Curated annotation (Swiss-Prot):
Gene3D superfamilies: 3.40.47.10
NCBIfam families membership: AcCoA-C-Actrans (TIGR01930)
Record field: catalytic activity: 2 acetyl-CoA = acetoacetyl-CoA + CoA
Superkingdom in the source lineage: Bacteria
Listed name of the protein: Probable acetyl-CoA acyltransferase
Length: 393
């Protein structure tokens, strides 16, 4: 079977809600990375066979936001492009679709990833198309409803985390401790240049003066403590334990990479970072969607012909501390190998981009001692996706 490799994997800094990227559309964040990847590899843009980009909150952006990103990023109009929505798994699903298209011989080079600007998601007035006869009307927050609400139970993703708290007996202190550790690991990595190789700075033009250049993730908090987090009120249930401090943020960002056949990479003298070994997807009861990575990880390992003990590093999306703790318990993961640079609780969770973001961060950790990695994300609606990669040799 054709070996599929990953190269030129990058991400933008991750912006906080209403932060530096509040006026930068998702497709502009994506375009920044596309332009950088083309320039860095020296690849002729016309040689890219297809572009596949995850994006969840698409309302108001225009037709096919991935196409907008590709064209603004310098790709010719002849390159076909489509947008993927698998909620939090969108970015990684895009890479899986690229992988599948190469294995089947349809493509040799695909640019894949994800992008999201949650700050720009619009408010909607449903049923207003033909006017209202009388009475009050309300707006729907497209970010909350299309991105963060379980439609089957009509409640916020945070309640699915509270459901896992009850099922697994996870304490508030455990969650807050997990969140603090994520922040500390991310702060340490940020201070010591641990993200420098994966981040492409984003230049934001200003009406007056020089552009603002964003180079670092905005959500990392160096001085957080369990004591400080313990003062936060529950966010989703009156007597709950999930808070804004032990959950991932609402964020803006993008992540992209080249997915190629090994033969094409050799032909073009592009040095791969890793080989894609296999993927796994899984579904569970939507009310406990956060536990779905367990099944996805097991399937990805089986398809990759690997055991959990073969994995040197894990990048698992931290939707909620409770969700992460439940998955860690089920899989019995070694904590020293999981999210060694922190996770989404610290870095942020731009939902359409996160699947690609966790893989980008993983790829930049591979070396002679860390040769095999696994990444996974839970997905709203009761799903998960996972991937296994190995350092290219």
């Amino acid at each position: 079977m054709t070996r599929v490799v990953l190269a030129a994997a990058y991400r933008t800094p991750i912006g906080v809600f209403g932060g530096a990227f509040k006026d930068v559309p998702a497709y502009d964040l994506g375009a920044t990375l596309i332009e950088h990847i083309i320039k860095e590899t020296g690849l002729n843009p016309s040689e890219i066979n297809e572009v596949i980009i995850g994006n969840v909150l698409q309302a108001g952006q225009g037709q096919n936001p991935a196409r907008i990103a590709a064209m603004k990023g310098g790709l010719p109009e002849t390159v076909p492009v489509f947008t993927v929505n698998k909620v939090c798994g969108s970015g990684l699903k895009s890479i899986q679709l690229a992988y599948q298209s190469i294995v089947t011989g349809e493509n040799d080079i695909v640019l894949a990833g994800g992008m999201e600007n949650m700050s720009q998601s619009p408010m909607l007035v449903n049923n207003s198309r033909f006017g209202f006869k009388m009475g009050h009307q309300s707006m729907v927050d497209s970010m909350v409803y299309d991105g963060l609400t379980d439609v089957f139970n009509q409640y916020h993703m945070g309640i699915t985390a509270e459901n896992l708290v009850e099922q697994y007996g996870i304490s508030r202190e455990e969650q807050d401790t997990f969140a603090v550790n994520s922040q500390k690991k991310a702060a340490n990595a940020q201070q010591n240049g641990g993200f420098d190789s994966e981040i492409v700075p984003v230049s934001i033009p200003q009406r007056k003066g020089e552009p603002i250049v964003v180079t670092k993730d905005e959500g990392v908090r160096e001085n957080v403590s369990v004591e400080k987090l313990s003062r936060l009120r529950p966010a989703f249930k009156k007597d709950g334990t999930v808070t804004a401090g032990n959950a991932s943020g609402i964020n803006d960002g993008a992540a992209m990479m080249l997915v190629m056949s090994e033969d094409k990479a050799k032909e073009l003298n592009i040095e791969p970072l890793a080989v894609l070994d296999g993927f796994g997807s899984h579904g569970v009861d939507p009310s406990i969607m956060g536990i779905a990575p367990v099944g996805a990880v097991e399937k990805a390992l089986k398809r990759s012909k690997k055991e959990l003990s073969d994995i040197d590093v894990f990048e698992l999306n931290e939707a909620f501390a409770a969700q992460s703790l439940a998955v860690d318990r089920e899989l019995k993961l070694p904590p020293e190998k999981v999210n060694v640079k922190g996770g989404a609780i610290a870095l942020g969770h731009p939902i359409g981009a996160s699947g690609a973001r966790v893989l980008v961060t993983l790829l930049h950790q591979l070396n002679d001692e860390v040769e095999t990695g696994l990444t996974s994300l839970c997905i709203g609606g009761g799903q998960a996706i996972a991937a296994v990669v190995s350092k290219y040799k």
